[in-house]
Amino acid sequence: MGVRRAKPKNFFETGGKVNEFNGCSLLLSNRLTTRYRKINIMTEQQHIVGPDQIFFSVTDDKGVITDSNSVFESISHYLREELLDSPHNIIRNPEMPGGAFRLMWDALESGKPFIAYVRNMAKDGLPYEVLSTVTPLEGGGYLSVRTRVSDPEFASKIWWLYGETRGKEDELLGEGKNRRETAEIGAQFINDKVSDHGFVDYEDVQRFLLPHEISIWEKNASNEVVAEGRLAPVSKAVGELRTEEENWSDRQDAMAELAAQLTSVGAKIQASLARTADLKTQADVWSGKLTPMEAIPLNVAVSLGSIVTEYVDDLQKRLQALRGSIEHVRSTIALARVQTHCLAAFVREVAEDSAGGRKVVSMKTLTSALTTEVEAMGKNVAQYGTNLSRCERRLQAVLSLIEIPQQMIMDWLKSVQEFGPSVDMPELISAVAGEIESSASMVDELNGLLGRLGTIEQKSPRHMLDLLHTVDAEVRKLQV
């Protein structure tokens, strides 16, 4: 486990009192602190969260701990009595940037969940790393569920970013800015820097992070159910809920793949229309030599292509909206899966070591939070269905419009090949033939993808809500 090591106080730990340092030593301290964070943030001795461990804590609106499970107590090395009524930052690691927590509170205060890699500190001074999800509770307060970090390679990029952010925050504190200002600047720094890893902002990171992490973590998760005793009905219903969530997740993964393919084909359509416009440029070179029967079809095809371009641009926007709604649904499902695993693990914990009414209340809290997520999933699914219908209609319109200029170009080539060109123009004929072949393949691909859109079943999460009502009813029986 390791022994707590004495650490020299740095600027942050002394509360930011500038008068304790002269300018030179402060600058040196900040540089060394930043370097320490960047180099050692992944190499320090630490507590390891087990591959199937999952733990939770509940706080009030001010972040004071009101409940937890035994796994949290074990990993944090705090007794339950020490955790209860303590601020949640009792486990805060000073290496974590204030900007990360500013992002968290901004999300929570707007009613949104928050997902992040977090480096906490146990009572003995050693860190432990987790994937943390925090969600607002319907009756007030927050639920945080944590698992181990399942993708250390991706996490290393975030740890490095945290180190950079803390270094920047220390500099700002040294310049006399207060902690609130510093955290706000740190949050913006994180939001901006995630673009280095291909993300739009930190919300974009969250939409990727949770489905990605939970899919890896679940490979080691326990699917054991409580077969006997008063908790058996609860455990059975939770197990059925987990199966239903897996089916939902599989459907959304397939839909996400299809949406990505559609977006790719949409880009191909845009490229095809650009090539059709290039044919007009090539035809203009021969404008004085082509007969009207040779020039007019190409000019009309290009003119129609410009109209199709507007439809294709709109299609791309709708496909992006569809992908966004799919990502929201996938993220919501992933959050529900995390909370379901947490509930299942806690039911097993209660079955092994019952602690009376207190743990029944905890189960009610977990069930209520999970119900909120599934209800949110229903709203996201409704938006997803709307976006899907719009994409289908726009795809059908684009396909219908593409056929007209495509047919005109095909007729032009057929006529030239049958009756011969009025002038020798092999480059133009070759370009037209190549575009016909390319666009035909693209249209076939688009028709195939359009057909697949209707094969992916879209369902309401009603069955999941029914299962949760069963869980809630069984939990209430335990209070009798």
Where do the PLM segments sit?
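Acidic, low-complexity, intrinsically disordered peripheral segments
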Residues: R462-V480
